[in-house]
């Protein structure tokens, strides 16, 4: 029995060590190691491979508890409306001033503070624009119940309607991306300058020269962001991820819950 405990602890320590490396392959091995540790715990302590598999599968099936009991009941507005709003306090978003300075140091002009609220869900956007490169930037805060996180994004709008976005959103996105939206997801530990350089490389890779980008009126940017949010909801209604609830609300369908679960599995092994 002692040998079994030592083996389990050894595999766990090796797994945690793998997760500390920055290499994607080692990170994914570490994620598989979590499943292996759970399997060994069940198998070695009971002698049953079935219990071992049950312990390992708990990591994969546990999200369904939250999906069925909470997410399935959530509603969202069918048409999200951005409004001007004051920035959150330092106790809510202590990094906002520092991030703002970092964005402005790279040639961006602060355009507006906007956001939308729905029940326990709040989203705040600090919007910027750099006219010479026709690129908009945003510092975004998502606050839902007891969970809050922020991310940075850079977007360039092509004249053909395609939106090219580079961001460090920390999770797999909870909605299907609209067909006209091309996303380049990068690591969360990049500075804004590194994010900006990555966005430039993203545009260059796809042959998007500055003259192919739409030049925006700064005052129009909040309306464009609102338009993007509404387009996402409309696309996911059409895809069956969301379903209407009355005339003004939507919620996740069973297909949508399955989509969220698959997104969770992607996050389980993805380098973030």
Regions of interest found by a model, annotated:
Residues 53, 168-171, 185, 258, ...:
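Short, isolated positions within intrinsically disordered regulatory regions of eukaryotic proteins
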Residues 1-81:
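N-terminal alpha-helical membrane-insertion module
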């Amino acid at each position: 029995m002692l040998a079994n405990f030592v083996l389990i602890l050894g595999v766990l320590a090796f797994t945690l060590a793998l997760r500390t490396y920055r290499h994607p392959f080692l990170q994914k091995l570490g994620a598989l190691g979590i499943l292996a540790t759970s399997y060994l715990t069940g198998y070695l302590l009971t002698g049953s491979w079935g219990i071992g598999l049950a312990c390992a599968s708990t990591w994969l099936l546990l999200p369904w508890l939250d999906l069925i009991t909470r997410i399935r009941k959530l509603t969202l507005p069918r048409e999200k409306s951005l409004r001007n709003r004051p920035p959150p306090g330092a106790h809510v978003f202590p990094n906002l001033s520092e991030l703002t300075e970092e964005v402005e140091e790279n040639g961006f002009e602060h355009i507006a503070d906007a956001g939308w609220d729905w029940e326990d869900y709040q989203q705040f956007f600090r919007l910027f624009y750099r006219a010479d490169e026709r690129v908009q930037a945003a510092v975004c805060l998502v606050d839902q119940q007891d969970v809050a996180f922020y991310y940075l994004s850079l977007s360039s709008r092509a004249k053909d309607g395609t939106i090219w976005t580079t961001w460090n959103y920390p999770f797999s996105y909870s909605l299907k991306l609209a067909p006209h939206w091309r996303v380049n997801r990068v690591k969360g530990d990049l500075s804004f300058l590194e994010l900006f350089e990555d966005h430039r490389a993203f545009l260059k890779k796809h042959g998007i020269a500055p003259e192919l980008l739409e030049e925006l009126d700064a005052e129009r940017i909040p309306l464009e962001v609102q338009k993007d949010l509404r387009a996402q909801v409309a696309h996911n209604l059409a895809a069956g991820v969301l379903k209407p609830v009355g005339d003004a609300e939507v919620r996740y369908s069973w297909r949508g819950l399955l989509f969220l679960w698959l997104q969770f599995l992607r996050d389980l092994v993805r380098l973030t």
